[in-house]
Amino acid sequence: MQFSRIIVYGYPRTGSMWVYNILREIVQLCRYDIIPKRIPKSDKEMLKIHKNNLDIKNKKIISIIKVHTLLDKYQLKDAFIFMTKRDPRDSLISYMRFMKVKNLDITRKLEHISSYIDSVKHLRNTINSQFFLEIDYKDITLRPINLIMKILNFLKIDLKEDQIIDISKKYSKDSVKKMIEKKDLNIKKKLAKNKKVSNNEVVIMSPDNIRAFDENTGFQSNHVSNYKDGDWNDILTSDEIEEINSKFEAWIEFNN
């Protein structure tokens, strides 16, 4: 591969975790060693790994990180960059559900969408397009095999058809949901019996919000939801929709 670093950037709830795992599978099938071996829980940990590997000399080692934090030009140098994108009205509602935020005023909703748009603009203005691939959330959900082939083409990597199908099945919505639900049930059983739970098994958001965590993939409880794109139409109030669309609809329509 041309570069020994791959960076996946995604605003929360835009599909970056799926892309991250697809890339890890691809790189391992090509017989590269990947770092990190286990998935960190935070951007801070991810960025520490990235910083420590800015000057990798071993061409058989590939550093792959996923962040929500915007990086500067130096941090983005000599790397393949993948950015996931989604209608920010959908990512907003999905984020609120994932974080169990029931009440978010319109000001903070507008800030969420504005921040998403700023992040997209930042990356588009910072990165050499030759090494930058934008990934639409709809392709993740509707055309995963075609998307995997697109990623392979971008990286100039060939895999067999059955390998591509296997990757797609492994990270299908149903497969990931079953995997994390199994871990979630195991954590709940341990807690119910007052058994010790390893820090590597959970993400503690609050005493009432403890999520199972899979350190092999980074997926957490409720990472896969039953939310359907477009549901924001039925969840946001008519006044909220009017205000959001008056500010952002033109940009959203042009960029989605």
Residue ranges and their predicted role:
Residues 1-6, 10-12, 124, 157-256:
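PAPS-dependent sulfotransferases, especially Golgi type II membrane carbohydrate sulfotransferases
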Residues 1-64:
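PAPS-dependent sulfotransferase catalytic core
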Residues 12-14, 69-72, 87-91, 97-98, ...:
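Short, solvent-exposed loop/turn segments at secondary-structure junctions
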Residues 17, 66-69, 223:
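Histidine-centered active-site/metal-ligand motif
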Residues 65, 80-83, 133-135:
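Hydrophobic/aromatic beta-strand patches that form the interior of the parallel beta-sheet core
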Residues 71-79:
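Short loop/helix-cap segments at secondary-structure boundaries that form the rim of catalytic
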Residues 78-96, 244:
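Conserved phosphate-donor/acceptor-positioning beta-strand/loop module used by diverse small-molecule
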Residues 93-166, 174-180, 184-187:
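PAPS-dependent sulfotransferase catalytic domain
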